[in-house]
Structures are given as structure tokens and as C-alpha cells.
């Protein structure tokens, strides 16, 4: 695994963690809250964003305008049954969701969820590190690398891992501050 390949894989893990963070409510309306909502549409699980235009007319409202009015009830049901705790209001043309301010208890729950997503991201980074170090050790065993070269490579991999873990921790701190901000 080349150094660039290693960086790319680690960067993808950090991006996946950021996408997970984006799905956590912060008390303000944000279209990415609905990224994980799938709608049972003609017998197929379809992402909500491919069935409708999602916008935020103000900081407390999400507006959903389906491309096909026949899917309105399905979209409404998918949102209502999600774990987001949001209640959709259907006026026949647009589904509006009022995003209420978060309670203190809900804020703490979302902070725990963010911490869990961060830990999952760190575990993914550690798995990438383990695979890379295993490859370096194999090269050393096959006498393609000296002990010193192997040690230097492993140190470089560890430093890279530490850098990306610090990045995830920074994003976690930002997300927690965002969630706890009233």
C-alpha cells in the first residue's frame, strides 16, 4: 500500500465520519438531517433526496417538495417513523417539518451519538493502520525491507494515523459545541 493510498483511505474514513455527524440534529433546520431517510417507493427503498427537493426556508423549518405528488404520503410516513423525532406537516403540495429546539436530555443523547460515530471513525482508521503495518511486516519478513526501513515505515504510518485521529477529535469537538449551543 503506497503512502498516498494510505492517506486516501484514511481521508475517506474521516469523510464518512463527517457525513455521519451531518445527520445529527443540532436544533437548527438542515437538509442533511434527512440524508439517511429512505422511502418505500414502488417496492424499493429509495433515498428521500432522490424523490424530492429539500430546502430550509428558515432556521427552524425544512420544506420537502416531492417530484411526484403520489409519493407524499410515503415520504411523510418515512419521516414520521424515523428516529429523528420530527413531525411532518403535509399541505398537499409541500411537506413542512418544524425543527423544535432540542431539550437538554436530547442534546446529551446526540452528543453520545456523535461520540459513537467518532469512535467508529477511529476504529476504521486503526484497521487501516493495522493492514498497512501488516503489509510492511510482510515485506520485512520477505527480506524486501530492512528492519530499520520497516521501523521507519511503521512510525510514519502511526504518525499519519495520529494526525487523522486528531482530525476526527477536532470535528467531534465542533459538533458537540454545535449540539450544546442553545
UniProtKB/Swiss-Prot annotation:
The keyword Nucleus does not apply. HAMAP family: RRF. Keywords: Cytoplasm, Protein biosynthesis. CDD domains: RRF (cd00520). Signal peptide: none annotated. It is found in: Cytoplasm. One of its GO terms (cellular component) is cytoplasm. It comes from Prochlorococcus marinus (strain MIT 9313). Responsible for the release of ribosomes from messenger RNA at the termination of protein biosynthesis. May increase the efficiency of translation by recycling ribosomes from one round of translation to another. The gene is frr. The keyword Protein biosynthesis applies. This is Ribosome-recycling factor.
